[in-house]
Amino acid sequence: MKKVFFKTFGCRTNISDTGVMMQNLKDFELTANESEADIIVVNSCTVTNGADTGVRSYVNSASKLGAKVIIAGCGAFSKGEELFAKNKVFGVFGHSEKEHINTLLKSEERFVQMGDLTSLDDTIVSDYAGKTKAFIKIQEGCDFRCNYCIIPFVRGDARSQDESKIIEQIEKLALNGYGEFVLTGTNIGSYGKDKGTSLGKLVQKIGALKGVRRVRLGSIEPVQIDESFREILAEPWLERHLHIALQHTSQKMLAIMKRRNHVKRDLELFQELSSKGFALGTDFITGHPGESEAIWDEAYASLEQFPLTHIHAFTYSKRDGTPSATMSEQVKGDVAKQRLKMIESLVEHKNIAFRQAHHLPLEVLIEEGKEGLYSGYDQYYNKVTIQTSRDILKEWVRVDDYDIRMEANYAKF
């Protein structure tokens, strides 16, 4: 039986997609060692140039191992055919084809099978190999058309998974011992708009299921937080961390980016959620075309007011085919990187201030560790490192006594 190795790049949605592919692999053996694989499936990301570079570099190194290299994921749409034409990969397939992976990998002929951008998966994933938490894809695609973003062109328009299928998958995973569920998708806040329901209503039902200990949400847009979502904020099973995508804190830049959020309303929302004890994360792009010194100064001064604890910040990456790619007022790379460092430093200090102000008992799911040193994430999505002689891998641990350090909270018992 031929052995298959999966290499997953990018977001939590890709982790979920890899789970779907593994679940449908019936006539092959999975391996965790790429050097012994007959076939290497690269579930790729294309959100930035850096992501493309990482995938391309891995494909080059993987091809030297003698295995057939197959590219899937978002990069299949942006770079797949180019890699195929250069004989860098044996095959390419799109999102809608991943449930046919068992047949595709049997092909003796090189192939490109892109499929469509309208389908949803039917597979119920019952296990995530090597993972302590389960990733539940509740929707696919995005109806937003932000000027810098290529993702709608490689994931399609927003479409919601059937609620019954989501519930069934979580129930099966809970029976298999999973207690933390991470809801993923391209734009999860759009869940239900095509089905007459909402994200808040779905999450309320998930939280009521037997075995669900913690629900973590992927990124949400500020405009998607409605009353049904506010109704779940006090629920004990909801992670006390929310990731709300701002992308920028200058109103002028938001207009240039064609974003739907508004700085003043965003700040009010963040202050409301912070007052309820939530840790708050966001995305931020520095160096987007048009980000003048005046706009940057305005944005930084505004960002200082936000009660943030986490940030996923990155410099602007030109994506061919997007409106931003043709904008003339480019920002120098070194300037964008310096601005990136500024906001990362700002939020790093905000994070430790939050932890000092919320020195409360922590509930930690231990995700990795060995030889007496373990780590996991608490209900605020902060890393906790634990030194102990006990084997606590994959356990839920309550931590009352701990030190607050810049890089993580630290406990010993």
Residue ranges: model-predicted function:
Residues 75-76, 222-225, 390:
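Short beta->alpha connector loops
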Residues 45, 149-156, 214-223, 250-259, ...:
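Conserved strand-turn element in the central/C-terminal portion of the radical SAM core barrel
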Residues 41, 74, 101, 183, ...:
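Residue-level signal for inorganic ion chemistry
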Residues 175, 200-209, 214, 225-284:
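Radical SAM/AdoMet-radical enzyme domain recognition
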Residues 195-207, 227-241, 291-309, 333-338, ...:
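Short, electropositive alpha-helical surface patch
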Residues 1-190, 227-231, 242, 263-272, ...:
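Proteins enriched for Cys/Gly/acidic motifs involved in redox and nucleic-acid/cofactor modification
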Residues 326-413:
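Terminal RNA-binding accessory module
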Residues 46-51, 178-205, 209, 220-228, ...:
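Conserved glycine-rich "GG(E/T)P / GGGxP" loop and the immediately following alpha-helix
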